[in-house]
Amino acid sequence: MITDPLLSVRNLSITFGSRSVIHDLSFTANEGEAVAIIGPNGAGKTVLLRALLRLIPYQGEIQWSHRARLGYVPQKIVVDRQLPLSSRDFLIAKLRFLKLPDKELEQVTTELGLTSQLLNANIGTLSGGQFQKVLIAFALLGHPNVLLFDEPTASLDELTEERIYELLHSLQTNRAMTILLVSHDLSVVSRNADLVLCLSKGKPCMGPPKQILTPEMLQELYSAPPQYYRHIAEHEAANPSADIPRERGRC
């Protein structure tokens, strides 16, 4: 039986010049867990992911188990709409770089429901949701068992956002993946996360959603009363015949 954590972070500190972004952060993540990273803007959520990927310098210890195979989906990639590259070619580039068999691309695109029409389309012409799915497919090539997501639904419409989160939940369930997810959506965090890691200018905190997502904790974290965005699925389950609410509350 495996007992050691997949990820262990000890006394992590990150500074940019004289500004401390993360100070003395320690936490662990185990196989199959979904860890949501929350906090106000500027708290260091994206910085933490970049440090976990060893893309930026840091002080302290970040230890990945030898079992960990990482995939990463950034918050945003700017693509020239005139770029003569199809979604399929974009994915094949990684396939060839990793020397993977062609069947893996077929398996991943089938699992994510990527159609031939989408795969053959110029990557610069895709909608936000379509491009996000392609980025997830890109991350899944190579059989990772850990996925790091930096606000995977930023700037997406409500329905597309819901579908992306359903997809992430399916990946965690069906593949027993460990997921580290930066999100401002407290509704998604409360429903899907096993653990919540709070980053703020004060002392970081970590625990299950019921322990962390309390009015008192969120008031301290955000210095404002928390608001939850009620998703389509939640609203329809409670009110099958009612109109979908249009207010979007987030922290």
Q: Could you say what each language-model-derived stretch is?
A:
Residues 183-184:
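H-loop/switch region of ABC-family ATPase nucleotide-binding domains
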Residues 102-118:
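Conserved ABC ATPase "signature" region
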Residues 158-160:
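Helix N-cap at the start of a conserved alpha-helix in ABC-type nucleotide-binding domains
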Residues 147-151:
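Catalytic Walker B motif of ABC-type/P-loop ATPase nucleotide-binding domains
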Residues 122-126:
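Conserved ABC ATPase signature
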Residues 214-216, 221-251:
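ABC ATPase nucleotide-binding domains
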Residues 195-209:
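H-loop (His-switch) and adjacent beta-strand-loop-beta switch element
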